[in-house]
């Protein structure tokens, strides 16, 4: 393997029309890697910091020229000459250069762009697909897609409180079949919503964003769409929710304000509500059911539902091994959402996935609401045999780019490809 000879960053746009960072890395022996950095709408308090310029005269203050400059002026001179294959050493160098706990000096968007582009350049130099370069020849498990087909909360301008209602085609025999099932249900949902007189505009992640009467109506409508598409809810297709409760939590009164429904709930009442929903609908996964700082609430939720429902920590764990270790020790949750830009380097991302698996927690590799055509997370999902991926509806190119990459990977793997379906939920006690 050869050394890095050039690193270059530029400002480009993400799927929401906001600026983001793109990084290119070149090696001595002709390796080339390009990576684009995603951005979240509902962000965790403890996430690595995304550097924005704050100049209101440019992109309403959301420019990333400072992050781009940090790559070109500070990071590039330090990593040019380093061995491109030494991902851990390069990521360690990036962390040292920044010197802060949350990557606020150089920006997680600058650091991540470099980290991912380095991996792509190394894979390119070796002539290997990225998933195989990162995961070796054991990388062959295709993830079950967690498809966000109905949006609310911070991802849509409507009166639905829960941020994401998702389907998981666990009964499929292959990823290709799972994607087809998801797409058919998505189109079926559009027809169901139209028949009810609801809007079929889509939100940030490609799901529909109608003004429904209640959060429960969203679940009922999706069940109707699954059946209309010819599938069996609870057998072939399960439901998942991302509540994004930190967006509902009021710090002043310590309660959850479901404004769409006009109700206020305590932590205990939220847990009781989830128990009721799980008893009525085939819900297999709940993400961020309580506020990121409501550890007692999360512990109660885990005690009540942790054996039969995947309880995913997103804002709770922020892809951070310190936060995850605390959760494991306290018996909170049984799954972690993996977002590369929450932590900022590929090495730290892999560390979080490894820690989760060792503790019997699942790892769900995830996009952000502000995405790009970059499909790296598809390769990461296969490289780590994560078993689950959350990357939006089968709609909008920024989401479909990941699904199409997984189709390519499944084709490349041929008969060695594995689609585990319901077996991906090894954290649940049957």
UniProtKB/Swiss-Prot annotation:
Annotated Mg(2+) binding sites: 242, 287, 314
Keywords, ordered alphabetically: Cytoplasm, Glycolysis, Lyase, Magnesium, Metal-binding, Secreted
GO molecular function: magnesium ion binding; phosphopyruvate hydratase activity
Gene3D superfamilies in UniProt: Enolase-like C-terminal domain (3.20.20.120), Enolase-like, N-terminal domain (3.30.390.10)
InterPro entries xrefs: Enolase (IPR000941), Enolase-like_C_sf (IPR036849), Enolase-like_N (IPR029017), Enolase_C (IPR020810), Enolase_CS (IPR020809), Enolase_N (IPR020811)
Domain of life: Bacteria
Descriptive protein name: Enolase
Gene that encodes it: eno
């Amino acid at each position: 393997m050869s050394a890095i000879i050039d690193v270059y960053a530029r400002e480009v746009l993400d799927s929401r029309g906001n600026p983001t960072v793109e990084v290119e890395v070149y090696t001595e022996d002709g390796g080339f890697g390009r990576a684009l950095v995603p951005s979240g709408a509902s962000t965790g308090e403890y996430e690595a910091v995304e550097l924005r310029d704050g100049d209101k005269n440019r992109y309403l203050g959301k420019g990333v020229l400072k992050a781009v400059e940090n790559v070109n002026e500070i990071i590039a001179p330090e990593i040019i000459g380093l061995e491109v294959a030494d991902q851990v050493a390069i990521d360690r160098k990036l962390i040292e250069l920044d010197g802060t706990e949350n990557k606020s000096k150089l920006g997680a968007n600058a650091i991540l762009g470099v980290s991912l582009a380095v991996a792509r350049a190394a894979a390119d130099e070796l002539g290997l697909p990225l998933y195989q370069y990162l995961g070796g020849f054991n990388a062959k498990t295709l993830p079950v897609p967690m498809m966000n087909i109905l949006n609310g909360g911070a991802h849509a301008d409507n009166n639905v409180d829960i941020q994401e209602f998702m389907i998981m085609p666990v009964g499929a025999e292959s990823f290709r079949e799972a994607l087809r099932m998801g797409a058919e249900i998505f189109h079926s949902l559009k027809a169901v919503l139209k028949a009810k007189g609801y809007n079929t505009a889509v939100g940030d992640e490609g799901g529909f964003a109608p003004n429904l009467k209640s959060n429960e109506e969203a679940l009922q409508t999706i069940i109707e769409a699954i059946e209309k598409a010819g599938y069996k809810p609870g057998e072939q297709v399960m439901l998942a929710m991302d509540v994004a409760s930190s967006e509902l939590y009021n710090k002043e009164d310590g309660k959850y304000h479901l404004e769409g429904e006009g109700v206020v709930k305590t932590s205990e009442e939220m847990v009781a509500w989830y128990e009721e929903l799980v008893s009525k609908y085939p819900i297999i996964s709940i993400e961020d059911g309580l506020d990121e700082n409501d550890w007692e609430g999360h512990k109660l939720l885990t005690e009540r539902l942790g054996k039969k429902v995947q309880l995913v920590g997103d804002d709770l764990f922020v892809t951070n091994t310190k936060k995850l270790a605390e959760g494991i020790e306290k018996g909170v949750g049984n799954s972690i959402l993996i977002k590369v830009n929450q932590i900022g380097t590929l090495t730290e991302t892999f560390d979080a996935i490894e820690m989760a698996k060792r503790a019997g927690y699942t790892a769900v590799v995830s996009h952000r609401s502000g995405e790009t055509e970059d499909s790296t997370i598809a390769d990461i999902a296969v490289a780590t045999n994560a078993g689950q991926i959350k990357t939006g509806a089968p709609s909008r190119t920024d989401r479909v780019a990941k699904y199409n990459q997984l189709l390519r990977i499944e084709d490349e793997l041929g008969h060695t490809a594995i689609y585990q379906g319901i077996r991906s939920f090894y954290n649940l006690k049957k």
